[in-house]
Amino acid sequence: MKEETKVTIIIPTCSSERIPLLIQTVKSIQAGTYKNVHPVIVADGNKDIYDVASKQLNNVTVILNKKRRDWIFSINRVLKEFDSEYYIYASDDLIFPTDCIKNTMKAMQKCFPDGFGVISLGKKNKCIFGLFGNKWVNHFPNREVFCPDYIHYCSDGELLGTVKKLKKFAFPPERESQVQHFRLNDETRRLARKIRARDREIWHKREEKGYLWGIDFNLITRQ
């Protein structure tokens, strides 16, 4: 039997309210048929999450942002600090069906055997909760796959535009086995909403300039 390659699964989380969901998310990953998984939880400015996850979960890595830095920073931090052949960017309110990662890896090996592409784990035609290879990560400066102009919103949408333009985007054929996303109206979502207008303004400015992260590497906030 061919040895499974490692998949690092990045899970940012900021609200203690979601600890039960976070634990459920990780356990659904570990219960899957694809076993060579490495969940990395980013406790985003929340020491309580760091302590609870470290004590209650096995075979995971938990890291702490000393202050809240939000989604884009947290995902990019793991991409910079953890070596892996493949990565999945996820969230703390998902359920991974049993064969989800296995089927997604099969699709990756069929569509992009060198890992230079994104396979969606979401059920909608959006670049959300995707699997990509280390070669894809190395395409980006400082391994920042998610455009650092943004804080929380819009970066995955811009990534969708990039992978479609490059023809490096695919779905597994087994769409029914992709992740379930709860999309709760809770503290995490309320915190994110505070910067939604800011991120959308950046999105429009980048569109006006014709910027597309991954096609080019232009930034507005660092000019």
Give residue spans per PLM region.
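Active-site nucleotide-sugar/metal-binding loop of Leloir-type enzymes
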Residues: N76-Y86
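Short beta-strand/loop segment that forms part of the nucleotide-sugar
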Residues: N36-N46, I63-N65
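Short, acidic, metal-binding catalytic loop of nucleotide-sugar glycosyltransferases
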Residues: Q24-N36
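Short beta-strand-to-loop acidic/aromatic patch adjacent to the donor-nucleotide binding site
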Residues: E85-I95
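A short, glycine-/small-residue-rich helix N-cap motif at loop->alpha-helix starts
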Residues: K66-F73, L79, F129, I151-Y153
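C-terminal catalytic/acceptor-binding lobe
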Residues: Y153-Q223
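Conserved donor NDP-sugar-binding/catalytic core segment of glycosyltransferases
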Residues: T98-F129
